[in-house]
Amino acid sequence: MGRCTIADVAMLIRWRVSLMVAGATFFGAMLAVPHVTITHLLASLATFLLAGGCSAINQVQEADLDAVIPRTASRPIPCGRIGHMYGSLMGLALVTVGWMVLCLAGGLTSLLVGIGIVAVYNGLYTPLKRRTSFALLVGAAAGAMPPVVGWLAVGGHPASPMLVVVYTLYLLWQIPHFWLHAARDREAYRKARLPLPLLSLPHERYARLLKVWFHAYAVAVLMVPAFPLLEGVGMRIMVTLCGIALLFAAMLAVRKRRVALHIADAVLCAVMVVLLIDRLAIPVSLF
C-alpha cells in the first residue's frame, strides 16, 4: 500500500455523494417534523457514515472494475494507495458507527432499516452488477431510502402518502440518472464486461426503455400536485412545470444526453425544495 492521504480517504468514502445522502435524510426528516431537532442531525450523520462505509466496501468489492473505467481508475484502491484490508476495515468501522448513531437517533426500526440498506447495496446490488443489466433496480431500492430513514427516525408514519411519493421519486430518478452517466463511459463498461442495458440491448430498445423511465419519473412528479400533498397553488404550478420539463427531457434523452441528465437532476432538487417550502409554510408568490 502506498502513502494514504486525507484526499484518498475522502475519495474512498465519496464524501460528496455521502453528503448528498445525508442531505436527503435531513430533507425526509424535515418533511415529517418541520423543525430541527437533535434527531434530525443524528439521522443525517448516521446516513453520512453509512454511505461512506458502503462506498468503501463497494470500492473493495469492485477494485478490478474501477481499474479499467477511466472515471474510477484514479480511486485509491485501484491505484494502490489504499490496500484492500485497510479499505474493508474503514468501511466496516464507518458502517458500524453509522448503525450505532442511527439506533440512537430512531431506535430499533431505524437500525433495521440501516442494516437492510447495507445488505441490499453491498450484499445484493454490487454482486448483481456483474450478472444482470437490471441490477440497478435493486440498487435504486436502497438508494431511495435516505429520505425514508430521516422520516422514520423523527417518528413519521411509515404509510404516509407523502413518504410513498418521495420514495417513488428518488427510486425513479436513479435509473435515468445512472444510465445517462454510464453512456459517457460506454466503451469502458464494455471492456469491464458489465451487462448494462445500453450494451446488452439493441439501441432502439434501449432508447425506448430510457424514455419509459423518464415518463415514469414525470408521472411520479405530476402525482405530487394531483394529490393533496401541497397546500399552495403556486407550489402545485411549479411541480407541474417540473413534470412537463421531464417529458421534454425524455425526447432529448438519447440525442442530448447531458441536457436530459441536467433536467432530471434539477427536477429532483426543485421538487425537494418545493415540498420543503410548502411544508414549512413559507409564503411564495409566482407573480
Swiss-Prot record:
It is a multi-pass membrane protein. GO terms for molecular function: protoheme IX farnesyltransferase activity. Keywords: Cell inner membrane, Cell membrane, Heme biosynthesis, Membrane, Transferase, Transmembrane, Transmembrane helix. Pathway: Porphyrin-containing compound metabolism; heme O biosynthesis; heme O from protoheme: step 1/1. It holds the Pfam family UbiA. It is found in: Cell inner membrane. InterPro entries: Protohaem_IX_farnesylTrfase, UbiA_prenyltransferase, UbiA_sf. The keyword Membrane applies. Its EC number is 2.5.1.141. It is an enzyme of class 2 (transferase). GO terms for biological process: heme O biosynthetic process. The chain crosses the membrane at residues 19-39, 100-120, 134-154, 162-182, 212-232, 233-253, 267-287. It comes from the Bacteria. Gene3D superfamilies: UbiA prenyltransferase. It catalyses: heme b + (2E,6E)-farnesyl diphosphate + H2O = Fe(II)-heme o + diphosphate. Its main location: membrane. One of its GO terms (cellular component) is plasma membrane. Belongs to the UbiA prenyltransferase family. Protoheme IX farnesyltransferase subfamily. HAMAP family: CyoE_CtaB. Carbon 2 of the heme B porphyrin ring is defined according to the Fischer nomenclature. Converts heme B (protoheme IX) to heme O by substitution of the vinyl group on carbon 2 of heme B porphyrin ring with a hydroxyethyl farnesyl side group. This is Protoheme IX farnesyltransferase. It comes from Nitratidesulfovibrio vulgaris (strain DP4). The gene is ctaB.
